A protein has these predicted regions:
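Compositionally biased alpha-helical segments
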Residues: 1-375
């Protein structure tokens, strides 16, 4: 992540930005949404609609999530509030919510390799951009690898234990009666042994490690950012093996690869056979193609930008089938985006008609690419 930080003293600090554990354009920024602009269509929804939190009048609070590569600027307007600008010019006011992204200090790696921390109260604005060709690469590099599960393999940037995300980060554990820490740059593979791990170094040396959450069943999960899918988080129960790979084996997007977001557009087919085409608002929440659909399959969680989704079909109260570009198919559950807790879909049809479809009445949703929208 690269950008220019303007402080309240009008200093401009340019460099690579570390935001908590977020380092890369594919990492996810999360904050709380303020209000819901789609409640103005409450009369269209009808008085018999009960939202997923059990209240009649207002839907539950939703989170805003997108990848850092979609963000143009962030302006600090309060200790827990920001104005976030996305590519294309739209600006949204957001609050801290359950996320810790708002209100914390950030670190900037300068051109000379030194780092400078900036506390939240001293930040005026952050403007993101591609790093100039003249600036050296950052000192640290991401963990690139393949994660194997019983259901398949995931190849991308890895965040271990939802914490360690760079080659200089340390994998902690115990061997025999003493503690040991190994930098990820020295690790070739990590194999789960249930409540311990077999760690193989690039040198060929094998380490049997146990006793810390990096290497046992208390691990919080292994996140993999896949360039054209989104983020996958594998729970320890489903984790089998991690293998490190060279970074150049990944086709990583750069800042300019993230296009300006567009409205969701497609067709909703209802269970009584009605076809409704137009601009969509999904779960009375997500309205742009850079926002994320959340769901789980067993111990594996998915966060998928809507721009990669092509079809969404609710199968029952608990599960939804989705199809991504690239012919990937998944069955997802647990999260309100893909269960009976979904608050329904608004369809803005040509001519100004607005139609609300309850989730229980949705048979299929087809989402179209920008090319299709312009046809």
């Amino acid at each position: 992540i690269y950008g220019e930080v303007t402080t309240v003293m009008n200093r401009k600090i340019c460099g690579y930005i570390t935001w908590g554990k977020k380092l890369y354009w594919t990492d996810i920024f999360t904050a709380g949404k303020i209000g819901n602009p789609y409640m103005r269509y409450r009369d269209i929804m009808g008085d018999n609609v009960r939202f997923s939190d059990g209240r009649r009048d207002t839907p539950p609070e939703h989170e805003f999530s997108c990848r850092f590569g979609n963000i143009r600027s962030i302006r600090v307007i309060g200790d827990r509030r920001i104005e976030l600008g996305v590519k294309g010019g739209n600006v949204t006011e957001l609050e801290r919510g359950r996320s810790l992204a708002i209100g914390n200090w950030i670190t900037v790696e300068l051109r000379d390799g030194k780092t400078e921390s900036v506390v939240w109260d001293h930040i005026s604005e952050i403007v993101f951009s591609a790093a100039p060709d003249t600036i050296p690469e950052p000192k640290d590099h991401p963990i690139a690898g393949i994660v194997e599960t019983p259901y398949g393999m995931y190849k991308g940037l890895v965040q271990w234990d939802l914490d360690e995300n760079s080659l200089d980060a340390l994998l902690d554990g115990r061997m025999e009666s003493s503690g040991i820490s190994v930098a990820f740059k020295n690790i070739g593979s990590i194999k789960s042994l249930g409540n311990s791990s077999l760690v193989t170094l690039h040198s060929g040396r094998e380490l049997y490690m146990w006793g810390e959450n990096d290497v046992n069943a208390t691990n919080r999960g292994i996140a993999i950012n896949l360039p054209s899918v989104g983020q996958v988080i594998v729970g320890w129960h489903d984790f089998k093996l991690f293998r490190s790979i060279p970074l150049d084996q990944l086709n990583l997007p750069v800042y300019d690869d993230f296009a300006a977001p567009v409205r969701l557009f497609g067709r909703v087919e209802t269970r009584n056979g009605r076809l409704l085409e137009g601009v969509l608002v999904y779960d009375l929440d997500e309205a742009m193609d850079f926002e994320l659909l959340d769901g789980q399959n067993g111990n594996i969680s998915y966060r998928i930008p809507f721009k990669y989704l092509r079809k969404i079909e609710p199968k029952n109260y608990k599960y939804t089938w989705v199809k991504l570009s690239g012919e990937i198919e998944l069955v997802l559950g647990t999260m309100c985006d893909v269960t009976a807790a979904n608050d329904g879909v608004l369809v803005f049809r040509a001519g100004g008609e607005v139609v609300y479809v309850r989730w229980r009445d949705v048979k299929r949703i087809e989402l179209w690419t920008k090319v299709k929208q312009n046809d």
